């Protein structure tokens, strides 16, 4: 199984935008090389999470080893390392590219280059990978291979004269792709004699074996039973099981430089074997780890609360289990006066947040209330201390802080030119600064904006898609923190601030947001027995208010005629009762009210 010389190993990945046919192409490669028998074949073979198949995206990385006999009658081993295509998971992409020597750049021949593909191609170029352009879906009636070739040449600067025309669905061009992987992708360097260094590019939690780590051996050899050390976390483990992914797991006794495989070593949590960490032998350690390890930092935060307070322990267990599989997920307990006990969770981006929420609800049967997403603000206090705050309710008062800075991102949008106007409006309305605009090919344009991340995390992506009828695509990356006149907007219901409705907003937008919020809450909160004032305030200054009138019983119904003082006495008595009720009564804020905060920005 592992006696193939290094010169006949090829490690490659597939770079493609969502829906450009990456998973189908991977299926065809597995089928053509006979790695997966036809009867076991199912659509999207490598996307084995139910959610991935449903959304048609790749979330967790997969790897597969294929044996292939090339036209020169030699047997080769091709290791496909699958990458997630979504912008939230770009760190995972960079690690899996670091484990390869080549990449297939798959572009839909009817759509052309999209923004996410660009971001990943630039990562591949940084890692010095050999890039093979493949134009997929050429069987579609709308395919324009010549236009797309020109587009790739102009945007990415790759020579497309040898681009492969393929259709993963019908199997056209698959043999050519396999041949070009063998002939164009360089073999790994033969460094079997060096001390062991292996790069972790993925890990997942298995109920019986603990964490199973996927890795690529860069230097040296690893054998079953070796004691290994993970350089970033400093932990040591014994390798109980070692194997290759074909794409199901097949055990082997040793793996040498250039190979891709997995090992299990009774590791308790994925945090101990983080993506990007370097594996080395405990007794013969490598001098330095492989470059490029970064701890994935959450960018978007939100509160998660169970609708039923009794489900709090279940939510905690569910988060612990997801955390085993997802080192980028952060959470800590928090309490809210309105919603009881819950967790403050951190995510890589909006898609990551949605996926975690959906997995909690689907796999663990939880009903959750999610607060509005927020980002990490940097606050400098008057004493000169720097605080990082992800929850608006923990923002210090204005008299204690010198300045607030918020994270900014650069957003690159690629769009057909007829939507440029509406997308520029969108950029301006989100406090964006226009930076650049290039015409890629006739009819397609790229727009570059700098925006506060807070404006991107709410619903920027959805708005961009709806304004461009789904044709535009975007990618964003962090460019640093900038100072802005930000204020904390508090919502008071019956004179009590509701911490889960608080938000940090730009001063110029505060009145508009406050006004919109209170009028929305007025519609959503049901009437009570007493009058409920709803106010939006900045500090002690109320900037907008509405009130919900009381429900009242007609206490005069049984007075027929009679003295006016009798009626007055009954009305006074009712008034006193309402007053007492108002001072002790609690207002129930329904779940829809919290969701309203998320939607205010759309209107």
Swiss-Prot record:
GO terms for biological process: positive regulation of translation; translation. It is a peripheral membrane protein. GO terms for cellular component: plasma membrane. The keyword Protein biosynthesis applies. GTP binds at residues 19-24, 136-139. Residues 7-189 form the tr-type G domain. It is found in: Cell inner membrane. It catalyses: GTP + H2O = GDP + phosphate + H(+). Pfam families: EFG_C, GTP_EFTU, GTP_EFTU_D2, LepA_C. Keywords: Cell inner membrane, Cell membrane, GTP-binding, Hydrolase, Membrane, Nucleotide-binding, Protein biosynthesis. SUPFAM superfamilies: EF-G C-terminal domain-like, P-loop containing nucleoside triphosphate hydrolases. GO terms for molecular function: GTP binding; GTPase activity; ribosome binding. Its EC number is 3.6.5.n1. Required for accurate and efficient protein synthesis under certain stress conditions. May act as a fidelity factor of the translation reaction, by catalyzing a one-codon backward translocation of tRNAs on improperly translocated ribosomes. Back-translocation proceeds from a post-translocation (POST) complex to a pre-translocation (PRE) complex, thus giving elongation factor G a second chance to translocate the tRNAs correctly. Binds to ribosomes in a GTP-dependent manner. HAMAP family: GUFP, LepA. Belongs to the TRAFAC class translation factor GTPase superfamily. Classic translation factor GTPase family. LepA subfamily. This is Elongation factor 4. The gene is lepA.
